A protein has these predicted regions:
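Non-catalytic cap/lid and distal C-terminal segments of serine-dependent acyl enzymes
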Residues: 1-170
Length: 170
C-alpha cells in the first residue's frame, strides 16, 4: 500500500506540519478520505507504528490521513495554535489538491483515539458541512470530570491554555 510521509506548510498554524497518508491500491479515484486523529501522548506516526492500519484498509478504496495534532485536543487554542481550523478547514483542501481525494462532505470522515476521539467529534460538530461522519474510540469526552478537575493534575495548565478555564472546572 503506498505510504507518504507528507509535510506541508500550514498557513493557519504558521508552521510546517506533517501527516502520514495511506493511498489505496484498489478502486477508481476520487477516493473518500478518513482523517485518523491521534491521542494526547502520541503524534501522527502512532497509527502506522502501533496498529495494523495498512492491513485494515488494504482492500478498501480509501485514503487515510493521519495528521499531527500536537497536544491541541484539535481545538483553536485560547493561547496557542488554531488546530481545529487547521485540520477542519485547511487540511482537507491541502489533501484534495495533492491526492486523488473526493472533494465533498460525503467523501470525508473523522475518527480518533482518546484526545483524537474528542477531536473527531469536535471537528464533525464544528464543521458539519465538511465531514459526513465521526467515530470516537475511547474518546476523552468528559471535561469537567475526573481527572481533569483535580488540582494536582499535571496537565491542567496546558489544558487551560488550550481549552480555557470553563472546560475543566477552572
Amino acid at each position: 500500500m503506498p505510504f507518504c510521509d507528507f509535510h506541508y506548510f500550514s498557513k493557519k498554524l504558521g508552521i510546517q506540519s506533517a501527516a502520514y497518508v495511506l493511498l489505496p491500491e484498489v478502486g477508481e479515484p476520487p477516493f473518500p478520505t478518513l482523517y485518523l486523529l491521534h491521542g494526547y501522548s502520541d503524534d501522527h506516526t502512532v497509527w502506522h507504528r502501533r496498529t495494523r492500519i495498512e492491513a485494515y484498509v488494504a482492500n478498501l478504496p480509501l485514503i487515510v490521513v493521519m495528521p499531527h495534532g500536537g497536544h491541541s485536543f484539535y481545538c483553536d487554542a485560547v493561547e496557542g495554535y488554531p488546530y481545529a481550523s487547521a485540520i477542519g478547514e485547511e487540511l482537507p483542501e491541502i489533501i484534495e489538491r495533492n491526492f486523488p481525494a473526493q472533494k465533498d462532505r460525503g467523501g470525508r470522515c473523522l475518527a480518533g483515539l482518546s484526545m483524537g476521539g474528542y477531536g473527531a467529534f469536535k471537528l464533525a460538530l464544528t464543521y458539519p458541512d465538511r465531514f459526513a461522519a465521526a467515530v470516537s474510540h475511547s474518546g476523552a469526552l468528559a471535561f469537567g470530570h475526573y481527572p481533569y478537575t483535580w488540582d494536582g493534575n499535571a496537565y491542567r495548565p496546558e489544558q487551560q491554555r488550550i481549552l480555557g478555564q470553563g472546560y475543566i472546572g477552572g
